[in-house]
Amino acid sequence: MRRKFLQSLRAPDAPLITAAIVMIVFGIGLRAQRLAFPRGLTWDEHHFVLNAKTYLAHQPDLNDHPPLGKLLIALPIHLLGDTSLAWRLAPFLLGCVNIVLVGLIAAWVAERRTAFWVGAALAAVDGFLIAYSRSALLDGMLACLCMAAVLTALRARSWPSFALASLLLGSACAIKYSAVVFVPVLLWVALSKPSALATAATLVLSPAAYPGWFSLGLWMAKQPFGPSAVVAETKRLYLHHASLTHWKHPLLSHWYEWFLPTRPIPMRNDPLSDGRMRVLTAMGNPLVWWLVNLALLFAIGSVVVALVLALRRRALGPATRRALGLAGPTARRSLIVAAWCAPIVPWWVSARDSYVYHYLPAYAFGVVLVAALFADALRRFRTAAFVALLVVGQVGFYYSPVWGQNPISREGVEQRALWRRWHVGFTLRSPFDP
């Protein structure tokens, strides 16, 4: 492995890989620096940190999500003590894993190792992913398990190894129910395997992992933890979520607003004595964010073109078999488009309150598509693709103060809020903060 890495640094892509490594190190540094600051709870952390501690105290969980995310937060608290660093350690670690997962899935889509470095670099310098690596919240961990499930399924060579993907997806559902939408994605991958039916059958293990984690949480809370108790609690939480249709919070946004986005979340805003402030916004790297939209259009367009050509040649059957078998770049992009769509589809048909953070698992797969597009561009436009990656890195460096909570003036913050509606997401506390 070391030899292959050194060879890659002597290859024509060496400058790009070197730049990507710098961006990755920089992004991990932004996630890690002053992770314990502030020492109090910030945006939404009270929902999960306080209930993580109730598990450790063997008291009932009053939060409206399944237990696993809070159990992951509780483990470092149990090992290291009740500190702000311990609260945020699990999201930080899984947030760093997200960087690797984006790169690995991008390498599978593009069938090029260079795509790994590009994907990891793009994920590393994106503020949306950074913010959920620096906060004791569930969505970054949810994205991690969803991507891990998809990657494990893609790499599985037999049904026992595919079973691990099913268990990972069931575990993701034990963080948030919304992960269940990835079942069709894993089913598509299963049908592409040589032993398709046996592999697809392992998806029944997804529900097996979910009650296991839920029972563990109920047991720790000294509550009934049998199958009937899990079913009753699941039903209660589902009905609670289904009733959240008030649309009163000022930071709520519809799914079609996420493409800009219109309401990024203001995670933290701590004033300093010299008039500056330390800010953490969930606004991503604007260039990456909008490139996700373009990459999606490109991927969907390539699917439409392939479909039209297949119809003209009267070769729809073979084209369908290639798509189901994930043969070729168009089919692989189609799978990632499906993975992007899966977390968003429920919001198309639901009137439930929604925030931009519900977009995070889909967004991660969107970054994969951007990396694959970069990898394709490298084949013909190596210099242009390299310059484009440098520009993305420069934009990330420009926005780094509002992702890494470095001291910055109010004017500096507002300069980074390119759109007037972003000002709230960058500078003001939500009136609903604790």
Report each predicted region and the residues it spans.
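Transmembrane helical bundles and short interhelical boundary loops of multi-pass, membrane-embedded
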Residues: 202, 206, 210-211, 219-221, ...
